[in-house]
Amino acid sequence: MTQEKHNAAILGGGSFGTAMASILAANGHNVNLWVRDPETAAAINIDRENTRYLPGAELPKEVTATDSLEEALGGASMVFVAIPSKAFAEVLEQARQWVPDEAVVISCTKGIYADGFLLMSELLHQYWPHTRIGVLSGPNLAKEVVEQKFTGTVIASPDETLRQTVQNALSCDYFRVYDNPDIYGVELGGALKNIYAVASGMAAAIGVGENSRSFLITRALAEMSRFAVKLGANPMTFLGLSGVGDLIATCTSSLSRNYQVGFQLGEGKTLEQAIECLGQTAEGINTIKLVADKAAELDVYMPLATALYKIVYHGQPLELMIQNLMSGEYKHDVEFQLGAFTS
């Protein structure tokens, strides 16, 4: 089958946006990579490298960096949005006039927008209602993607044709794209796991064992699915790449930004110091407070998320997380209750 060639726009020149640009260009698509800074755009075009976020990774000649949204979006049939959640709505508003009607638009951002507890796909529906919207999520550490280490991901959308289009555009011998119609569950999985990556990094810093880490990750999955079902997601989604797959990768890898921030916090650094050391966005830090507040509002039992909020934002000792894990109310080991899910 001959692959259709696309004009693709990537909004966001961070590590994941750059990784997506690399895959699309290597697959023969024309790619415009939008970055805010004109000097960064010029450097990428000259050096064929994003030295700040993915140093050493050569970008194909089909990638053109630009600081102009109009130029990036002109004639685009596919748009990948990889903007930090705090700036997501701002960029959507700025770009609104140049987004082509019926363009396939994919959110790559694993975060939650504070005003209204909105996921990124919900913001896309608000700002770009004339487009076709999906979400890309999974255990996709950007450095490994550009190093072409074999990776799986998920494209989620109720639009089957959109899912097939994205699968065809991104799939190659090292990047396999699965599909899922549960856009809300896939997106929630990507956002929620960042909380527990922070927790896992903190636990690693104080030297917990492998038993402890496995315990932490498994109970994190229970919290994620419990919370998501309350919001209407399919719990089975959390057994796939965008759920447990992403959770494992993010909670066990030092390449994970959220894990790195957690590790720094566990070593005794302040939140400000940890973020400064990272030099990039760690979505989990913002998500912790949003989810802890929402869990309280919805009366969802989330002892890990609640303890982590108190540790990060109120200076409580790290031992509180362990105490909550070990002394909370007794629960079933497996809590995937399909009866609670309504499509």
Swiss-Prot record:
Organism of this sequence: Alcanivorax borkumensis (strain ATCC 700651 / DSM 11573 / NCIMB 13689 / SK2)
HAMAP family assigned: NAD_Glyc3P_dehydrog
Chief subcellular location: cytoplasm
Protein's cellular compartments: Cytoplasm
Protein encoded by which gene: gpsA
Homology family: Belongs to the NAD-dependent glycerol-3-phosphate dehydrogenase family.
Protein's name according to its UniProt entry: Glycerol-3-phosphate dehydrogenase [NAD(P)+]
GO molecular function: glycerol-3-phosphate dehydrogenase [NAD(P)+] activity; NAD binding
Residues engaged in binding sn-glycerol 3-phosphate: 110, 138, 193, 246, 256-258
Record-linked PANTHER family: GLYCEROL-3-PHOSPHATE DEHYDROGENASE (PTHR11728), GLYCEROL-3-PHOSPHATE DEHYDROGENASE [NAD(+)] 2, CHLOROPLASTIC (PTHR11728:SF1)
Binding site for NADPH: 15-16, 36, 110, 142, 257, 283
Task performed by this protein: Catalyzes the reduction of the glycolytic intermediate dihydroxyacetone phosphate (DHAP) to sn-glycerol 3-phosphate (G3P), the key precursor for phospholipid synthesis.
GO CC annotation, single: cytosol
Biological process annotations from GO: carbohydrate metabolic process; glycerol-3-phosphate biosynthetic process; glycerol-3-phosphate catabolic process; glycerophospholipid biosynthetic process
Keywords attached to this entry: Cytoplasm, Lipid biosynthesis, Lipid metabolism, NAD, NADP, Nucleotide-binding, Oxidoreductase, Phospholipid biosynthesis, Phospholipid metabolism
